[in-house]
Amino acid sequence: MVEINGKEYGLFYSVRAHCEYDDYVCEHPNVSVTRAIIQKALIMSKAYCDIHGGTPLKSADIMNLPNSEYMKLMKAVVEQEAKDSGIEIETEPTEKNAVSREL
């Protein structure tokens, strides 16, 4: 779960969600890393809601976030995928590795 602007959203990494994400990236070879992560956030949010109910994230929800909330969501997506894949990562954002929202 990640809290964005006071509302909690669940993220669930599944093989199905991963396949949908991979299909999206394969179909769009010019996709930016930022857009790919946003797409993954939307798919993971939908996968969570399919299992647990609730309202999934929408792209407008993400694009209207303040930078701090946006970075929190991106971090949650990466951490959830890594956790469910059994990978240990370091995800503390810094100025050096910050990602722009420009698509």
Which sequence ranges carry the predicted segments?
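Short, surface-exposed, charged amphipathic helix/loop patches that serve as local interaction elements
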Residues: 12-103
